[in-house]
């Protein structure tokens, strides 16, 4: 059996740019990509916390240290500057590997300041 698992997650990053006429993708600060283990050109799913939009694209690297999150091309219709996003990548693996797997999660606040990194999503309490 093959399972699809969360590989990396950027939690609550803020959109800094939206460029409808760029050829596509989502530009992400290289430091952020590394924090979540996301590779340039890797497929990503984006969840807009502010408007509920969910869409797929691919990651490209933005300048290291820039704190840029730029939603480009047609996806720019799904997010505005200032919107909070959750950006995820996924990996497929065997059932046995999935049971040992831990994602790389990076949490952000304010103007895209990395607050902490984790290897799991916290258990939701009642």
Swiss-Prot record:
<dbReference type="InterPro" id="IPR009010">
    <property type="entry name" value="Asp_de-COase-like_dom_sf"/>
</dbReference>
<comment type="function">
    <text>Catalyzes the pyruvoyl-dependent decarboxylation of aspartate to produce beta-alanine.</text>
</comment>
<dbReference type="InterPro" id="IPR003190">
    <property type="entry name" value="Asp_decarbox"/>
</dbReference>
<keyword id="KW-0704">Schiff base</keyword>
<keyword id="KW-0210">Decarboxylase</keyword>
<feature type="active site" description="Schiff-base intermediate with substrate; via pyruvic acid">
    <location>
        <position position="25"/>
    </location>
</feature>
<dbReference type="Pfam" id="PF02261">
    <property type="entry name" value="Asp_decarbox"/>
</dbReference>
<keyword id="KW-0566">Pantothenate biosynthesis</keyword>
<comment type="pathway">
    <text>Cofactor biosynthesis; (R)-pantothenate biosynthesis; beta-alanine from L-aspartate: step 1/1.</text>
</comment>
<dbReference type="GO" id="GO:0006523">
    <property type="term" value="P:alanine biosynthetic process"/>
</dbReference>
<protein>
    <recommendedName>
        <fullName>Aspartate 1-decarboxylase</fullName>
        <ecNumber>4.1.1.11</ecNumber>
    </recommendedName>
</protein>
<keyword id="KW-0865">Zymogen</keyword>
<dbReference type="GO" id="GO:0004068">
    <property type="term" value="F:aspartate 1-decarboxylase activity"/>
</dbReference>
<feature type="binding site">
    <location>
        <begin position="73"/>
        <end position="75"/>
    </location>
    <ligand>
        <name>substrate</name>
    </ligand>
</feature>
<dbReference type="GO" id="GO:0005829">
    <property type="term" value="C:cytosol"/>
</dbReference>
<dbReference type="GO" id="GO:0015940">
    <property type="term" value="P:pantothenate biosynthetic process"/>
</dbReference>
<comment type="similarity">
    <text>Belongs to the PanD family.</text>
</comment>
<keyword id="KW-0068">Autocatalytic cleavage</keyword>
<comment type="subunit">
    <text>Heterooctamer of four alpha and four beta subunits.</text>
</comment>
<feature type="active site" description="Proton donor">
    <location>
        <position position="58"/>
    </location>
</feature>
<keyword id="KW-0670">Pyruvate</keyword>
<feature type="binding site">
    <location>
        <position position="57"/>
    </location>
    <ligand>
        <name>substrate</name>
    </ligand>
</feature>
<keyword id="KW-0456">Lyase</keyword>
<feature type="modified residue" description="Pyruvic acid (Ser)">
    <location>
        <position position="25"/>
    </location>
</feature>
<keyword id="KW-0963">Cytoplasm</keyword>
């Amino acid at each position: 059996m093959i399972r699809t698992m969360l590989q990396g997650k950027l939690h609550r990053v803020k959109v800094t740019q939206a460029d409808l006429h760029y050829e596509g993708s989502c530009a992400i600060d290289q430091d952020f990509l590394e924090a979540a283990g996301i590779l340039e050109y890797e497929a990503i799913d984006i969840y807009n916390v502010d408007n509920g939009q969910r869409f797929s694209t691919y990651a490209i690297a933005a300048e290291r240290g820039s704190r840029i999150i730029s939603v480009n091309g047609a996806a720019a219709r799904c997010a505005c500057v200032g919107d909070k996003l959750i950006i995820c990548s996924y990996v497929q693996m065997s059932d046995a590997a999935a049971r040992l797997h831990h994602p790389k999660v990076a949490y952000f606040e304010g103007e895209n300041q990395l607050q902490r990194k984790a290897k799991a999503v916290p258990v939701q309490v009642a």
